[in-house]
Amino acid sequence: MKARLLVLLCALAAADADTICIGYHANNSTDTVDTVLEKNVTVTHSVNLLEDSHNGKLCRLKGIPPLQLGKCNIAGWLLGNPECDSLLPARSWSYIVETPNSENGACYPGDFINYEELREQLSSVSSFERFEIFPKESSWPKHNTTKGVTAACSHAGKSSFYRNLLWLTKKEDSYPKLKNSYVNKKGKEVLVLWGVHHPSSSKEQQTLYQNENAYVSVVSSNYNRRFTPEIAERPKVRDQTGRMNYYWTLLEPGDTIIFEANGNLIAPWYAFALSRGFGSGIITSNASMHECNTKCQTPQGAINSSLPFQNIHPVTIGECPKYVRSAKLRMVTGLRNIPSIQSRGLFGAIAGFIEGGWTGMIDGWYGYHHQNEQGSGYAADQKSTQNAINGITNKVNSVIEKMNTQFTAVGKEFNNLEKRMENLNKKVDDGFLDIWTYNAELLVLLENERTLDFHDSNVKNLYEKVKSQLKNNAKEIGNGCFEFYHKCDNECMESVRNGTYDYPKYSEESKLNREKIDGVKLESMGVYQILAIYSTVASSLVLLVSLGAISFWMCSNGSLQCRICI
Protein backbone atom coordinates (compact mmCIF):
# COMPACT_ATOMS: atom_id res chain seq x y z
CA MET A 1 0.00 0.00 0.00
CA LYS A 2 2.86 2.32 0.80
CA ALA A 3 4.46 1.61 -2.58
CA ARG A 4 1.20 2.35 -4.38
CA LEU A 5 0.90 5.67 -2.57
CA LEU A 6 4.45 6.66 -3.51
CA VAL A 7 3.84 5.83 -7.18
CA LEU A 8 0.64 7.90 -7.16
CA LEU A 9 2.42 10.85 -5.56
CA CYS A 10 5.18 10.57 -8.17
CA ALA A 11 2.64 10.64 -10.99
CA LEU A 12 0.88 13.68 -9.52
CA ALA A 13 4.19 15.46 -9.12
CA ALA A 14 5.03 14.75 -12.77
CA ALA A 15 1.66 16.09 -13.88
CA ASP A 16 2.35 19.37 -12.05
CA ALA A 17 5.93 19.67 -13.29
CA ASP A 18 6.92 22.76 -15.26
CA THR A 19 7.32 21.97 -18.94
CA ILE A 20 8.70 23.62 -22.08
CA CYS A 21 8.23 22.36 -25.63
CA ILE A 22 9.78 23.22 -28.98
CA GLY A 23 7.48 23.25 -31.97
CA TYR A 24 6.51 24.97 -35.19
CA HIS A 25 3.69 26.99 -36.68
CA ALA A 26 0.60 25.43 -38.26
CA ASN A 27 -2.47 27.03 -39.82
CA ASN A 28 -5.59 26.23 -41.83
CA SER A 29 -3.82 26.40 -45.20
CA THR A 30 -4.71 23.75 -47.77
CA ASP A 31 -1.81 24.55 -50.13
CA THR A 32 -0.04 21.44 -51.38
CA VAL A 33 3.34 21.07 -53.04
CA ASP A 34 5.32 18.22 -54.54
CA THR A 35 8.85 17.26 -53.61
CA VAL A 36 11.31 14.77 -55.02
CA LEU A 37 10.10 12.15 -52.53
CA GLU A 38 6.47 13.10 -51.84
CA LYS A 39 3.32 14.23 -53.62
CA ASN A 40 0.73 16.70 -52.34
CA VAL A 41 2.48 17.75 -49.15
CA THR A 42 0.27 20.22 -47.25
CA VAL A 43 2.25 23.32 -46.26
CA THR A 44 1.59 26.51 -44.33
CA HIS A 45 2.78 28.87 -47.06
CA SER A 46 3.72 28.56 -50.73
CA VAL A 47 4.04 30.66 -53.89
CA ASN A 48 2.67 29.83 -57.31
CA LEU A 49 5.16 29.99 -60.21
CA LEU A 50 2.73 29.02 -62.99
CA GLU A 51 0.26 31.42 -64.58
CA ASP A 52 -2.82 29.62 -65.90
CA SER A 53 -5.32 32.44 -66.42
CA HIS A 54 -5.91 35.07 -69.11
CA ASN A 55 -8.61 37.64 -69.80
CA GLY A 56 -9.75 36.29 -73.17
CA LYS A 57 -9.19 39.69 -74.82
CA LEU A 58 -6.89 41.37 -77.30
CA CYS A 59 -5.30 44.37 -75.59
CA ARG A 60 -2.91 47.19 -76.29
CA LEU A 61 0.66 46.11 -75.73
CA LYS A 62 2.37 48.69 -73.51
CA GLY A 63 -0.16 51.26 -74.67
CA ILE A 64 0.21 50.55 -78.41
CA PRO A 65 -2.77 48.97 -80.21
CA PRO A 66 -2.36 45.92 -82.44
CA LEU A 67 -3.07 45.86 -86.18
CA GLN A 68 -6.18 43.77 -86.68
CA LEU A 69 -6.36 42.46 -90.23
CA GLY A 70 -10.01 41.45 -89.85
CA LYS A 71 -11.13 39.48 -92.89
CA CYS A 72 -7.79 40.08 -94.63
CA ASN A 73 -4.53 38.21 -94.29
CA ILE A 74 -0.94 39.38 -94.66
CA ALA A 75 -0.97 38.90 -98.44
CA GLY A 76 -4.18 40.86 -98.94
CA TRP A 77 -2.90 43.68 -96.74
CA LEU A 78 0.53 44.05 -98.40
CA LEU A 79 -0.64 43.59 -102.00
CA GLY A 80 -3.51 45.99 -101.41
CA ASN A 81 -6.58 43.83 -101.98
CA PRO A 82 -9.46 46.32 -102.52
CA GLU A 83 -11.37 44.54 -99.74
CA CYS A 84 -8.57 45.57 -97.37
CA ASP A 85 -8.71 49.33 -98.03
CA SER A 86 -9.35 50.01 -94.36
CA LEU A 87 -5.79 48.80 -93.63
CA LEU A 88 -4.08 51.28 -95.99
CA PRO A 89 -3.60 53.98 -93.29
CA ALA A 90 -1.85 51.53 -90.94
CA ARG A 91 1.61 52.75 -90.05
CA SER A 92 2.53 51.25 -86.67
CA TRP A 93 1.35 48.50 -84.34
CA SER A 94 2.40 46.49 -81.34
CA TYR A 95 1.55 43.18 -82.98
CA ILE A 96 -0.46 41.88 -85.95
CA VAL A 97 -3.63 39.82 -85.57
CA GLU A 98 -4.99 37.50 -88.24
CA THR A 99 -8.19 35.50 -87.88
CA PRO A 100 -8.06 31.74 -88.54
CA ASN A 101 -10.39 32.00 -91.55
CA SER A 102 -9.32 35.27 -93.16
CA GLU A 103 -10.72 35.19 -96.71
CA ASN A 104 -9.21 38.23 -98.42
CA GLY A 105 -5.69 37.49 -99.55
CA ALA A 106 -4.42 37.54 -103.12
CA CYS A 107 -7.64 38.23 -105.05
CA TYR A 108 -6.23 37.22 -108.46
CA PRO A 109 -5.33 33.51 -108.19
CA GLY A 110 -1.69 32.48 -108.12
CA ASP A 111 1.23 31.67 -105.84
CA PHE A 112 2.82 34.07 -103.38
CA ILE A 113 6.45 32.97 -103.54
CA ASN A 114 8.27 32.68 -100.18
CA TYR A 115 5.14 33.94 -98.42
CA GLU A 116 6.03 32.21 -95.16
CA GLU A 117 9.45 33.85 -95.12
CA LEU A 118 7.80 37.23 -95.67
CA ARG A 119 5.52 36.60 -92.68
CA GLU A 120 8.58 35.70 -90.63
CA GLN A 121 10.23 38.98 -91.62
CA LEU A 122 7.11 40.97 -90.74
CA SER A 123 6.94 39.38 -87.29
CA SER A 124 9.80 41.68 -86.23
CA VAL A 125 8.43 44.83 -87.89
CA SER A 126 6.58 47.31 -85.67
CA SER A 127 6.00 50.10 -88.19
CA PHE A 128 6.56 51.06 -91.81
CA GLU A 129 6.31 53.95 -94.21
CA ARG A 130 4.16 53.23 -97.26
CA PHE A 131 5.47 55.31 -100.15
CA GLU A 132 5.10 55.52 -103.93
CA ILE A 133 8.14 53.76 -105.32
CA PHE A 134 7.17 54.21 -108.98
CA PRO A 135 4.61 57.02 -109.46
CA LYS A 136 1.75 55.82 -111.62
CA GLU A 137 1.58 58.77 -113.99
CA SER A 138 5.26 59.38 -114.66
CA SER A 139 7.04 56.05 -114.36
CA TRP A 140 5.47 54.20 -117.29
CA PRO A 141 4.66 56.76 -120.01
CA LYS A 142 4.76 54.23 -122.87
CA HIS A 143 2.46 51.73 -121.18
CA ASN A 144 -1.15 51.68 -120.08
CA THR A 145 -1.63 51.89 -116.30
CA THR A 146 -5.44 52.07 -116.11
CA LYS A 147 -6.79 49.09 -118.05
CA GLY A 148 -5.18 46.49 -115.82
CA VAL A 149 -8.24 45.61 -113.73
CA THR A 150 -10.09 42.36 -113.10
CA ALA A 151 -13.42 41.14 -111.76
CA ALA A 152 -11.45 38.88 -109.41
CA CYS A 153 -10.41 42.01 -107.48
CA SER A 154 -13.68 43.88 -107.74
CA HIS A 155 -14.57 46.77 -105.48
CA ALA A 156 -18.02 48.27 -105.02
CA GLY A 157 -19.31 46.02 -107.79
CA LYS A 158 -16.71 47.13 -110.36
CA SER A 159 -13.50 45.52 -111.63
CA SER A 160 -10.46 46.79 -109.80
CA PHE A 161 -6.91 45.79 -108.86
CA TYR A 162 -4.39 45.83 -106.03
CA ARG A 163 -3.72 49.21 -104.40
CA ASN A 164 0.04 48.63 -104.23
CA LEU A 165 0.66 47.12 -107.68
CA LEU A 166 0.12 48.25 -111.28
CA TRP A 167 -0.93 45.87 -114.05
CA LEU A 168 0.90 47.31 -117.06
CA THR A 169 -0.63 46.54 -120.48
CA LYS A 170 0.12 47.55 -124.05
CA LYS A 171 -0.53 51.07 -125.23
CA GLU A 172 -1.74 51.64 -128.81
CA ASP A 173 -0.90 48.04 -129.78
CA SER A 174 2.65 48.42 -128.52
CA TYR A 175 4.47 47.20 -125.42
CA PRO A 176 8.02 48.53 -125.77
CA LYS A 177 10.72 47.16 -123.50
CA LEU A 178 10.65 49.00 -120.20
CA LYS A 179 13.46 49.57 -117.75
CA ASN A 180 13.06 51.38 -114.48
CA SER A 181 15.09 51.51 -111.29
CA TYR A 182 14.82 52.69 -107.70
CA VAL A 183 17.63 53.62 -105.31
CA ASN A 184 16.89 53.07 -101.62
CA LYS A 185 17.58 56.38 -99.87
CA LYS A 186 15.29 55.69 -96.91
CA GLY A 187 18.09 54.66 -94.57
CA LYS A 188 16.28 51.40 -93.73
CA GLU A 189 15.16 48.22 -95.45
CA VAL A 190 12.51 48.65 -98.15
CA LEU A 191 10.04 45.88 -98.95
CA VAL A 192 9.33 45.77 -102.70
CA LEU A 193 6.56 43.58 -104.17
CA TRP A 194 5.77 42.77 -107.79
CA GLY A 195 4.13 40.08 -109.88
CA VAL A 196 4.29 38.16 -113.14
CA HIS A 197 1.14 37.39 -115.13
CA HIS A 198 0.72 33.97 -116.77
CA PRO A 199 -2.07 34.19 -119.40
CA SER A 200 -4.32 31.28 -120.23
CA SER A 201 -3.73 31.52 -124.02
CA SER A 202 -1.53 33.11 -126.69
CA LYS A 203 -4.49 35.22 -127.72
CA GLU A 204 -4.73 36.69 -124.24
CA GLN A 205 -0.98 37.26 -124.28
CA GLN A 206 -1.20 39.25 -127.50
CA THR A 207 -4.32 41.11 -126.38
CA LEU A 208 -2.65 42.33 -123.22
CA TYR A 209 1.02 42.63 -124.11
CA GLN A 210 1.33 42.30 -127.90
CA ASN A 211 4.66 40.47 -127.56
CA GLU A 212 4.60 36.65 -127.66
CA ASN A 213 8.09 35.97 -126.26
CA ALA A 214 7.94 38.17 -123.20
CA TYR A 215 10.18 38.19 -120.13
CA VAL A 216 10.52 39.99 -116.81
CA SER A 217 13.89 40.66 -115.16
CA VAL A 218 14.43 41.90 -111.60
CA VAL A 219 17.94 42.66 -110.36
CA SER A 220 19.48 44.08 -107.18
CA SER A 221 22.65 43.41 -105.20
CA ASN A 222 20.99 40.47 -103.42
CA TYR A 223 18.38 39.44 -105.97
CA ASN A 224 18.67 38.40 -109.62
CA ARG A 225 15.89 36.57 -111.44
CA ARG A 226 14.49 36.38 -114.96
CA PHE A 227 10.88 35.22 -115.39
CA THR A 228 9.24 33.79 -118.50
CA PRO A 229 5.44 33.69 -118.67
CA GLU A 230 3.93 30.21 -118.73
CA ILE A 231 0.99 30.33 -121.11
CA ALA A 232 -1.53 27.55 -120.43
CA GLU A 233 -5.21 27.13 -119.77
CA ARG A 234 -5.90 26.27 -116.16
CA PRO A 235 -8.97 25.44 -114.09
CA LYS A 236 -11.01 28.48 -113.19
CA VAL A 237 -10.37 30.05 -109.80
CA ARG A 238 -12.44 33.12 -108.97
CA ASP A 239 -13.60 32.86 -112.60
CA GLN A 240 -10.00 33.24 -113.86
CA THR A 241 -8.07 30.75 -116.02
CA GLY A 242 -4.89 32.84 -115.88
CA ARG A 243 -2.54 33.11 -112.90
CA MET A 244 -0.33 35.68 -111.23
CA ASN A 245 2.71 34.83 -109.16
CA TYR A 246 3.75 37.35 -106.53
CA TYR A 247 7.33 38.07 -105.49
CA TRP A 248 9.13 40.24 -102.97
CA THR A 249 12.58 41.29 -101.86
CA LEU A 250 14.14 43.44 -99.16
CA LEU A 251 16.24 46.28 -100.56
CA GLU A 252 19.08 47.35 -98.30
CA PRO A 253 19.83 51.06 -97.74
CA GLY A 254 21.77 52.46 -100.69
CA ASP A 255 20.98 49.48 -102.91
CA THR A 256 19.31 49.74 -106.33
CA ILE A 257 16.60 47.53 -107.80
CA ILE A 258 16.10 47.40 -111.58
CA PHE A 259 12.98 46.19 -113.40
CA GLU A 260 13.19 45.27 -117.08
CA ALA A 261 10.38 43.67 -119.14
CA ASN A 262 8.66 43.53 -122.48
CA GLY A 263 5.38 42.19 -121.13
CA ASN A 264 3.57 40.47 -118.24
CA LEU A 265 5.00 42.68 -115.46
CA ILE A 266 2.83 43.50 -112.48
CA ALA A 267 4.87 46.51 -111.44
CA PRO A 268 5.43 47.92 -107.92
CA TRP A 269 3.42 51.05 -107.19
CA TYR A 270 3.87 51.41 -103.44
CA ALA A 271 6.67 49.97 -101.31
CA PHE A 272 7.31 49.88 -97.55
CA ALA A 273 10.25 51.26 -95.57
CA LEU A 274 10.44 48.94 -92.57
CA SER A 275 11.18 49.74 -88.93
CA ARG A 276 11.88 46.67 -86.86
CA GLY A 277 10.88 46.15 -83.24
CA PHE A 278 11.72 42.95 -81.40
CA GLY A 279 8.53 43.04 -79.35
CA SER A 280 6.27 42.65 -82.36
CA GLY A 281 4.83 39.48 -83.87
CA ILE A 282 1.93 37.87 -85.70
CA ILE A 283 -0.75 35.87 -83.93
CA THR A 284 -3.83 34.07 -85.21
CA SER A 285 -6.80 34.65 -82.95
CA ASN A 286 -10.57 34.97 -82.83
CA ALA A 287 -10.45 37.07 -79.67
CA SER A 288 -11.94 40.54 -79.84
CA MET A 289 -10.22 43.84 -79.12
CA HIS A 290 -11.01 45.63 -75.84
CA GLU A 291 -9.94 48.78 -74.04
CA CYS A 292 -7.23 47.17 -71.96
CA ASN A 293 -3.47 47.22 -71.66
CA THR A 294 -1.01 44.38 -71.15
CA LYS A 295 2.64 43.43 -71.28
CA CYS A 296 1.94 39.96 -72.66
CA GLN A 297 -0.52 38.88 -75.33
CA THR A 298 -1.42 35.35 -76.41
CA PRO A 299 -3.93 34.21 -79.05
CA GLN A 300 -6.30 33.19 -76.25
CA GLY A 301 -6.07 36.45 -74.32
CA ALA A 302 -3.81 38.82 -72.44
CA ILE A 303 -1.69 37.74 -69.47
CA ASN A 304 -0.91 40.24 -66.73
CA SER A 305 1.52 38.31 -64.57
CA SER A 306 5.06 38.50 -63.24
CA LEU A 307 5.30 34.74 -62.77
CA PRO A 308 8.12 32.96 -64.62
CA PHE A 309 5.98 30.25 -66.26
CA GLN A 310 2.62 29.92 -68.02
CA ASN A 311 0.69 27.02 -69.53
CA ILE A 312 -1.81 29.06 -71.56
CA HIS A 313 -0.29 29.14 -75.06
CA PRO A 314 3.16 28.63 -76.62
CA VAL A 315 2.75 31.68 -78.92
CA THR A 316 3.22 34.94 -77.04
CA ILE A 317 3.88 38.60 -77.84
CA GLY A 318 5.64 40.96 -75.44
CA GLU A 319 7.22 40.31 -72.05
CA CYS A 320 5.73 36.92 -71.34
CA PRO A 321 6.38 34.01 -68.98
CA LYS A 322 7.97 30.92 -70.48
CA TYR A 323 5.46 28.36 -71.74
CA VAL A 324 5.62 24.91 -70.11
CA ARG A 325 3.29 21.93 -70.21
CA SER A 326 3.09 21.64 -66.43
CA ALA A 327 -0.27 21.72 -64.67
CA LYS A 328 1.21 22.83 -61.33
CA LEU A 329 4.40 24.60 -60.25
CA ARG A 330 4.12 25.67 -56.61
CA MET A 331 7.16 26.42 -54.47
CA VAL A 332 6.97 26.00 -50.70
CA THR A 333 8.00 28.92 -48.51
CA GLY A 334 6.56 27.74 -45.20
CA LEU A 335 6.54 24.48 -43.26
CA ARG A 336 4.74 21.19 -43.40
CA ASN A 337 1.23 21.95 -42.22
CA ILE A 338 0.28 19.23 -39.72
CA PRO A 339 -1.95 20.79 -37.04
CA SER A 340 -1.85 18.82 -33.79
CA ILE A 341 -4.85 16.82 -32.57
CA GLN A 342 -6.14 18.96 -29.72
CA SER A 343 -8.06 16.15 -28.02
CA ARG A 344 -4.88 14.26 -27.28
CA GLY A 345 -3.79 16.74 -24.66
CA LEU A 346 -1.78 19.91 -24.59
CA PHE A 347 1.52 18.17 -24.03
CA GLY A 348 0.73 15.09 -26.04
CA ALA A 349 0.58 15.45 -29.80
CA ILE A 350 0.19 19.22 -29.71
CA ALA A 351 3.44 19.90 -28.03
CA GLY A 352 6.07 18.87 -30.49
CA PHE A 353 7.59 18.89 -33.90
CA ILE A 354 7.16 15.13 -34.18
CA GLU A 355 3.40 14.79 -34.36
CA GLY A 356 2.18 18.23 -35.33
CA GLY A 357 2.47 22.00 -35.32
CA TRP A 358 0.79 24.71 -33.30
CA THR A 359 -2.03 26.80 -34.68
CA GLY A 360 -1.80 28.94 -31.54
CA MET A 361 1.64 30.29 -32.42
CA ILE A 362 0.94 32.94 -35.05
CA ASP A 363 3.91 35.32 -34.77
CA GLY A 364 6.67 33.01 -35.98
CA TRP A 365 7.56 29.77 -37.72
CA TYR A 366 9.39 28.14 -34.81
CA GLY A 367 9.04 28.65 -31.09
CA TYR A 368 8.13 27.44 -27.63
CA HIS A 369 5.16 26.47 -25.52
CA HIS A 370 5.57 26.48 -21.75
CA GLN A 371 3.48 25.52 -18.74
CA ASN A 372 4.19 26.43 -15.12
CA GLU A 373 2.39 27.66 -11.99
CA GLN A 374 1.93 31.08 -13.60
CA GLY A 375 0.11 29.63 -16.59
CA SER A 376 0.97 28.61 -20.14
CA GLY A 377 1.61 30.30 -23.47
CA TYR A 378 3.32 30.39 -26.85
CA ALA A 379 6.39 32.40 -27.82
CA ALA A 380 7.95 32.46 -31.27
CA ASP A 381 11.69 32.36 -31.74
CA GLN A 382 11.99 35.54 -33.78
CA LYS A 383 15.66 35.19 -34.69
CA SER A 384 15.45 31.74 -36.27
CA THR A 385 12.13 32.64 -37.91
CA GLN A 386 13.50 35.84 -39.46
CA ASN A 387 16.67 34.11 -40.67
CA ALA A 388 14.54 31.43 -42.31
CA ILE A 389 12.21 33.98 -43.90
CA ASN A 390 15.15 35.96 -45.29
CA GLY A 391 16.85 32.86 -46.67
CA ILE A 392 13.73 31.44 -48.30
CA THR A 393 12.63 34.83 -49.69
CA ASN A 394 16.05 35.34 -51.28
CA LYS A 395 15.92 31.85 -52.73
CA VAL A 396 12.45 32.28 -54.22
CA ASN A 397 13.36 35.67 -55.67
CA SER A 398 16.54 34.21 -57.14
CA VAL A 399 14.66 31.32 -58.74
CA ILE A 400 12.02 33.64 -60.20
CA GLU A 401 14.67 36.07 -61.46
CA LYS A 402 16.73 33.36 -63.12
CA MET A 403 13.76 31.61 -64.73
CA ASN A 404 11.78 34.76 -65.50
CA THR A 405 13.39 35.54 -68.87
CA GLN A 406 10.36 37.08 -70.52
CA PHE A 407 10.25 37.22 -74.30
CA THR A 408 8.16 36.93 -77.45
CA ALA A 409 7.64 33.45 -78.91
CA VAL A 410 6.00 33.35 -82.33
CA GLY A 411 5.22 30.37 -84.52
CA LYS A 412 7.48 29.55 -87.45
CA GLU A 413 6.07 29.73 -90.96
CA PHE A 414 6.11 26.84 -93.46
CA ASN A 415 4.36 26.47 -96.79
CA ASN A 416 2.47 23.43 -98.02
CA LEU A 417 5.58 22.01 -99.70
CA GLU A 418 7.61 22.07 -96.49
CA LYS A 419 5.57 19.61 -94.43
CA ARG A 420 8.56 17.41 -93.63
CA MET A 421 10.49 20.44 -92.42
CA GLU A 422 7.47 21.66 -90.46
CA ASN A 423 7.02 18.27 -88.81
CA LEU A 424 10.72 18.15 -87.96
CA ASN A 425 10.50 21.65 -86.52
CA LYS A 426 7.52 20.64 -84.39
CA LYS A 427 9.48 17.68 -83.05
CA VAL A 428 12.43 19.91 -82.22
CA ASP A 429 10.17 22.48 -80.56
CA ASP A 430 8.41 19.72 -78.63
CA GLY A 431 11.79 18.46 -77.50
CA PHE A 432 12.83 21.89 -76.24
CA LEU A 433 9.44 22.32 -74.59
CA ASP A 434 9.78 18.98 -72.83
CA ILE A 435 13.24 19.99 -71.60
CA TRP A 436 11.96 23.35 -70.33
CA THR A 437 9.05 21.65 -68.60
CA TYR A 438 11.29 18.98 -67.06
CA ASN A 439 13.81 21.57 -65.85
CA ALA A 440 11.09 23.75 -64.32
CA GLU A 441 9.42 20.84 -62.55
CA LEU A 442 12.71 19.38 -61.32
CA LEU A 443 13.85 22.77 -60.03
CA VAL A 444 10.65 23.18 -58.02
CA LEU A 445 10.77 19.61 -56.68
CA LEU A 446 14.37 19.97 -55.53
CA GLU A 447 13.85 23.39 -53.95
CA ASN A 448 10.72 22.19 -52.14
CA GLU A 449 12.62 19.23 -50.73
CA ARG A 450 15.45 21.49 -49.59
CA THR A 451 13.07 24.00 -47.99
CA LEU A 452 11.18 21.39 -45.97
CA ASP A 453 14.46 19.82 -44.87
CA PHE A 454 15.67 23.31 -43.96
CA HIS A 455 12.66 23.84 -41.69
CA ASP A 456 13.10 20.43 -40.06
CA SER A 457 16.73 21.28 -39.42
CA ASN A 458 15.84 24.62 -37.85
CA VAL A 459 13.37 22.99 -35.45
CA LYS A 460 15.92 20.35 -34.54
CA ASN A 461 18.58 23.02 -33.93
CA LEU A 462 16.19 24.87 -31.63
CA TYR A 463 15.52 21.64 -29.74
CA GLU A 464 19.24 20.93 -29.37
CA LYS A 465 19.80 24.51 -28.18
CA VAL A 466 17.34 23.98 -25.30
CA LYS A 467 18.65 20.51 -24.54
CA SER A 468 22.24 21.73 -24.28
CA GLN A 469 21.18 24.41 -21.78
CA LEU A 470 19.00 22.27 -19.51
CA LYS A 471 21.30 19.24 -19.44
CA ASN A 472 20.15 17.04 -16.53
CA ASN A 473 18.02 19.77 -14.94
CA ALA A 474 15.18 18.45 -17.08
CA LYS A 475 14.24 15.27 -18.85
CA GLU A 476 13.02 14.66 -22.39
CA ILE A 477 9.44 13.41 -22.43
CA GLY A 478 8.98 13.14 -26.19
CA ASN A 479 7.19 15.24 -28.78
CA GLY A 480 9.80 17.96 -28.45
CA CYS A 481 9.13 18.57 -24.75
CA PHE A 482 11.25 18.84 -21.61
CA GLU A 483 10.02 18.37 -18.02
CA PHE A 484 11.93 20.40 -15.44
CA TYR A 485 13.25 18.83 -12.24
CA HIS A 486 12.88 22.27 -10.66
CA LYS A 487 10.38 25.07 -10.56
CA CYS A 488 10.72 27.31 -13.61
CA ASP A 489 8.77 30.56 -13.48
CA ASN A 490 8.20 32.90 -16.43
CA GLU A 491 11.59 34.55 -15.95
CA CYS A 492 13.23 31.13 -16.01
CA MET A 493 11.28 30.19 -19.15
CA GLU A 494 12.40 33.39 -20.87
CA SER A 495 16.03 32.63 -20.03
CA VAL A 496 15.67 29.23 -21.71
CA ARG A 497 14.18 30.85 -24.78
CA ASN A 498 16.82 33.56 -25.13
CA GLY A 499 19.76 31.27 -24.34
CA THR A 500 20.71 32.71 -20.92
CA TYR A 501 19.46 29.83 -18.73
CA ASP A 502 21.51 29.59 -15.49
CA TYR A 503 22.19 25.88 -15.12
CA PRO A 504 24.10 26.04 -11.78
CA LYS A 505 21.32 28.08 -10.19
CA TYR A 506 18.82 25.24 -10.54
CA SER A 507 21.14 22.23 -10.45
CA GLU A 508 20.87 21.54 -6.66
CA GLU A 509 17.06 21.63 -6.64
CA SER A 510 17.01 19.48 -9.75
CA LYS A 511 19.37 16.96 -8.15
CA LEU A 512 17.18 16.56 -5.05
CA ASN A 513 13.98 16.15 -7.05
CA ARG A 514 15.68 13.75 -9.40
CA GLU A 515 16.87 11.58 -6.44
CA LYS A 516 13.36 11.55 -4.93
CA ILE A 517 11.85 10.37 -8.17
CA ASP A 518 14.58 7.75 -8.65
CA GLY A 519 14.07 6.52 -5.03
CA VAL A 520 10.35 6.08 -5.54
CA LYS A 521 11.07 4.13 -8.66
CA LEU A 522 13.51 1.82 -6.85
CA GLU A 523 11.16 1.16 -3.85
CA SER A 524 8.22 0.52 -6.09
CA MET A 525 10.41 -1.83 -8.11
CA GLY A 526 11.20 -3.89 -4.93
CA VAL A 527 7.53 -4.16 -3.97
CA TYR A 528 6.65 -5.25 -7.46
CA GLN A 529 9.31 -8.00 -7.30
CA ILE A 530 7.87 -9.33 -3.96
CA LEU A 531 4.37 -9.28 -5.37
CA ALA A 532 5.58 -11.16 -8.42
CA ILE A 533 7.18 -13.95 -6.28
CA TYR A 534 4.11 -14.19 -4.05
CA SER A 535 1.86 -14.45 -7.05
CA THR A 536 3.98 -17.22 -8.56
CA VAL A 537 4.03 -19.31 -5.34
CA ALA A 538 0.31 -18.85 -4.74
CA SER A 539 -0.50 -19.90 -8.28
CA SER A 540 1.63 -23.05 -7.92
CA LEU A 541 -0.09 -24.06 -4.64
CA VAL A 542 -3.53 -23.61 -6.18
CA LEU A 543 -2.48 -25.78 -9.11
CA LEU A 544 -1.19 -28.58 -6.79
CA VAL A 545 -4.34 -28.57 -4.62
CA SER A 546 -6.52 -28.74 -7.71
CA LEU A 547 -4.53 -31.65 -9.09
CA GLY A 548 -4.78 -33.57 -5.76
CA ALA A 549 -8.55 -33.07 -5.53
CA ILE A 550 -9.05 -34.38 -9.07
CA SER A 551 -6.90 -37.46 -8.36
CA PHE A 552 -8.83 -38.28 -5.12
CA TRP A 553 -12.16 -38.01 -6.93
CA MET A 554 -11.04 -40.32 -9.73
CA CYS A 555 -9.75 -42.93 -7.29
CA SER A 556 -13.01 -42.92 -5.31
CA ASN A 557 -15.22 -43.69 -8.32
CA GLY A 558 -12.87 -46.28 -9.83
CA SER A 559 -11.73 -44.18 -12.76
CA LEU A 560 -8.25 -44.26 -11.40
CA GLN A 561 -6.63 -47.20 -9.56
CA CYS A 562 -4.16 -46.39 -6.86
CA ARG A 563 -1.78 -49.04 -5.53
CA ILE A 564 0.48 -48.47 -2.61
CA CYS A 565 3.28 -50.97 -2.31
CA ILE A 566 5.31 -51.34 0.87
UniProtKB/Swiss-Prot annotation:
Cytoplasmic side: 551-566
Pfam families recorded: Hemagglutinin
Broad class of the protein's primary localization: virion
Lipid attachment, kind S-palmitoyl cysteine: C555, C562, C565
Residue intervals annotated with topology Extracellular: 18-529
Disulfide-bonded cysteines: C21-C481, C59-C292, C72-C84, C107-C153, C296-C320, C488-C492
Membrane topology label: Single-pass type I membrane protein
GO cellular component: host cell plasma membrane; membrane; viral envelope; virion membrane
A GO MF label: host cell surface receptor binding
Domain of life, per lineage: Viruses
Record flagged with keyword Glycoprotein: yes
Free-text description of this protein's post-translational modifications in UniProt: Palmitoylated.
Transmembrane segments: 530-550
Glycosylation sites: N27, N28, N40, N144, N286, N304, N498
Stretch forming the signal peptide: 1-17
Similarity comment: family membership: Belongs to the influenza viruses hemagglutinin family.
Protein name, as recorded: Hemagglutinin
Lineage of producing organism: Viruses, Riboviria, Orthornavirae, Negarnaviricota, Polyploviricotina
